[in-house]
């Protein structure tokens, strides 16, 4: 049940964030299939970048706590050199790099917005760990994307009680 609540919180944030157009969950290798929704347009395209995509990675239990680790991908498309209309900043390669850097910068800001919103939310039963690791990625998909993967650890109360087992 806890993963469902975290997934819903991420969807709510994605839907309310003005710079996010699509959201999905599941296996990152299957981004763009039925696990991704377009939040902004009636287009039949499943992904309209920028995209936020969440993948539950692991869970561990300790005395009184369940830790759920979720990888949250913040990604956007990087324009191809051909669509940039020629040479930018003196060199096509530099133009490409400028665009990639802008995408990385924008996606890092969106990731920070999500982290801020998820940290110490008094309305939720879980808390986000104060340390979130962010790892950049570039050109990781066929559709030329760049962005960040935030590894978030959610701490959820767990009593280890047999009374919670359905009968």
Would you name each region that the model predicts?
Residues 1-65, 165-167:
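Small/polar-rich, solvent-exposed N-terminal microdomains that initiate assembly or binding
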Residues 10, 54, 72, 114, ...:
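Hydrophobic beta-strand residues in large extracellular and virion-surface proteins
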Residues 80-103:
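A solvent-exposed, charged loop/short amphipathic helix patch at secondary-structure junctions
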């Amino acid at each position: 049940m806890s993963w469902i609540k975290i997934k819903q919180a991420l969807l709510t944030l994605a839907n309310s964030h003005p710079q996010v157009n699509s959201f999905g969950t599941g296996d990152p290798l299957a981004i763009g299939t039925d696990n991704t929704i377009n939040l902004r347009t009636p287009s039949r395209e499943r992904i309209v970048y920028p995209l936020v995509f969440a993948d539950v990675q692991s869970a561990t239990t300790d005395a009184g706590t369940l830790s759920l680790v979720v990888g949250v991908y913040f990604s956007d498309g990087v324009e191809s050199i051909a669509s940039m209309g020629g040479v930018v900043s003196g060199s096509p390669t530099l133009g490409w790099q400028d665009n990639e850097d802008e995408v990385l910068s924008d996606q890092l800001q969106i990731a920070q917005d999500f982290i801020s919103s998820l940290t110490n939310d008094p309305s939720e039963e879980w808390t986000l760990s104060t340390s979130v690791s962010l790892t950049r990625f570039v050109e990781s998909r066929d559709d030329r994307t760049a962005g960040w993967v935030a590894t978030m650890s959610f701490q959820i109360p767990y009593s280890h009680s047999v009374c919670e087992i359905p009968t």
